[in-house]
Structure formats: structure tokens, C-alpha cells
């Protein structure tokens, strides 16, 4: 993946917009472990709407966000509103949330961005919800129990700023001992 990134950026870490990279992954895919992987599509998510962000993460899993990284965040586990200068752009994955904010994966660690910082346009510049076959696998069901047709419809809703109705799947029913053996 790193080689492909450097091929795209001209051999150095010159950066790229997330949407440009997602377009390449949608059209060509990326090579990992000797296999090519593509995404079906993606939509931009309005990160200033907290409930929409939560829905995107719940339905589509980890979502890429573009950050204008302030220097204070390079040394802290909690990323909050700050007046420190921007050191550069950074692409991370938002992978969960709680009452305080969103959890992001970066530099091999998990950090928390407070809701005040996350929903601001000062530090975030882009957020996307991608849909990939790796998310729903060959059974066409996501880890959250949604079928691929619902995922495609919900992707369009999220992109339009609409929070889809999220009905949790029924819990699995265990087979009683002695039955089905």
C-alpha cells in the first residue's frame, strides 16, 4: 500500500485528498497481500452533524477523515479545541464514539477527538463513508446485520445528510444442546 501511495504522490509524502484516493480505490483498487481490493463507492459525510457521524460509523464502520493537524494533537491522547498552529494535513480513521467525542486510529494508536473539535471546520476538512465488499463479505451481510441493498440505500441517505432508520438485527438463536447434531 505504501508503494502505491508513493507512486501516486510522485515518490514522496506530498499528501493527497481522501476523495482522490477513494476514487483510485474505487476504479483500480489497491494491492495488499497479493490481492486487489476495491470499494463499491463512497459519499461525503457532514461531520458537523454529530448524529449523522454516529450513523455513518455504525453502518459503514471506520470512516476516513481529513484533519488539519494542530501541533498540540501530536503529543496528546485527547485531541481538543486548541490555539496551536497547524503542522500539516493528516488522514485518520474514525472508528467509534462516546459522549466525549470520536475515537480515531492514527500512528498505531487510538486517540479521542472531542465533539467540539470534531464538529468544527477548523480542524476537520473532509469525512467519507465508504462501502466495500470487505465490509459485507460473500454473504452480503455487514457485521451490523444489514444486507448490501440496504447498505447501498443508506450510503445515499448519509451522503444526502439523512440519518437512515437503523433497525438492529435479531439476535442469533442458539441451538439447544442435542438438536442439530
Task: Give, region by region, the residue ranges found by the protein language model.
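Catalytic-core signature of thiol
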Residues: 1-180
